[in-house]
């Protein structure tokens, strides 16, 4: 097979909230158009009576990703939540063509989103650009497996199949899940546990704290405990179901912690 250059179309930028449950798949923000990573190494450079001393210092890595906005997209929402709340986010640059080990070459880092820009022209889609500053430096490695809809997204989210190989719709056309129903809660003096019915087709659930809808956790179960609340305090909790198609509309419940026990 003749050697070919790495094509930009094959390189995908994946993200994951630091609150995502262990074992969760990475998120591929929709409609990516451009991406880049860059690194700069500081050099120790001094002149001495014995001549010039030159040596390597620390490395500062950064990244930029541009994409068109999509309502309800889970990957884009994870980025926005990390930016709004000043949280770290996990970040991968992945070559989606398998290497000689039958795996995917990748770079990984924890990062902060330094800037986010919306371009809202009269014509065309809304363009969103983000810049990231990596904590430490990017780590090189290999990803064992990736969801088919990420690998084959440029082909419509799927590759050739044999008759009867799978069931369901094309991976790239997964409909949004329904909103969680029948939210209930139990309370202590400093926490509330919210429960809801399972949503068909949901891979996980985002739980948001307060009126500002700050992401508290991404969970794969149908309950979550929110802690660190003052006694006798109301707290609005929103829950949304998530799958490969994006995030569902939110369902809301107003909770209240128990009063503090009297010490008199």
Swiss-Prot record:
UniProt keyword Cytoplasm, yes or no: no
GO biological process: symbiont genome ejection through host cell envelope, long flexible tail mechanism; viral head-tail joining; viral translational frameshifting
Subcellular location, record wording: Virion
Modification(s) after translation: The tail tube is formed by the proteins gp17.1 and gp17.1* at a ratio of about 3:1.
Database matches in InterPro entries: FN3_dom, FN3_sf, Ig-like_fold, Phgtail_TP901_1
Residues in Fibronectin type-III domain copies: 179-261
Keyword terms, alphabetized: Viral genome ejection through host cell envelope, Viral long flexible tail ejection system, Viral penetration into host cytoplasm, Viral tail protein, Viral tail tube protein, Virion, Virus entry into host cell
Any one annotated GO CC term: virus tail, tube
Superkingdom, natural source: Viruses
Protein function: Forms the 160 nm long, sixfold helical, rigid tail tube. Binding to the entry receptor triggers structural rearrangements of the tail tube leading to ejection of the phage DNA into the host.
Subunit structure, as described in the record: Homohexamer. Self-assembles into a long sixfold helical tube. SPP1 virion tails are composed of about 40 stacked rings, and each tail ring is rotated by about 21 degrees relative to the previous one. Interacts with the tail completion protein gp17.
Name of the featured protein: Tail tube protein gp17.1*
The species this protein was found in: Bacillus phage SPP1 (Bacteriophage SPP1)
Upper classification of the organism: Viruses, Duplodnaviria, Heunggongvirae, Uroviricota, Caudoviricetes
């Amino acid at each position: 097979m003749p050697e070919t250059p790495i094509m930009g179309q094959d390189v995908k930028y994946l993200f994951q909230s630091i609150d995502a449950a262990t074992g969760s798949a990475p998120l591929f923000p929709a409609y990516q158009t451009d991406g880049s990573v860059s690194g700069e190494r500081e050099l120790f450079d001094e002149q001495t009576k014995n001549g010039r001393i030159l040596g390597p210092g620390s490395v500062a890595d950064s990244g930029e990703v541009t994409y068109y906005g999509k309502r309800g997209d889970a990957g884009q929402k994870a980025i926005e939540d990390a930016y709004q709340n000043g949280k770290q986010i996990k970040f991968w640059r992945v070559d989606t063509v398998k290497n000689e080990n039958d795996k995917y070459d990748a770079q990984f880092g924890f990062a902060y989103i330094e800037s986010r820009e919306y371009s809202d022209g009269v014509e065309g889609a809304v363009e969103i650009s983000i810049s990231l500053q990596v904590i430490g430096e990017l780590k090189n490695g290999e990803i064992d497996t990736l969801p088919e809809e990420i690998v084959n997204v440029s082909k419509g989210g799927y590759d050739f199949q044999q008759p009867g190989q799978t069931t369901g719709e094309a991976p790239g056309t997964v409909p949004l899940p329904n909103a969680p129903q029948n939210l209930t809660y139990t309370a202590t003096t400093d926490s509330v546990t919210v429960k809801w019915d399972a949503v068909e087709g949901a891979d996980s659930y985002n739980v948001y704290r307060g009126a500002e809808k700050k992401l508290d956790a991404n969970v794969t179960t149908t309950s979550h405990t929110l802690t660190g609340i003052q006694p006798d305090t109301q707290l609005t909790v929103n829950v949304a179901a998530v799958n490969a198609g994006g995030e569902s509309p939110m369902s809301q419940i107003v909770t209240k912690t128990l009063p503090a026990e009297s010490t008199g």
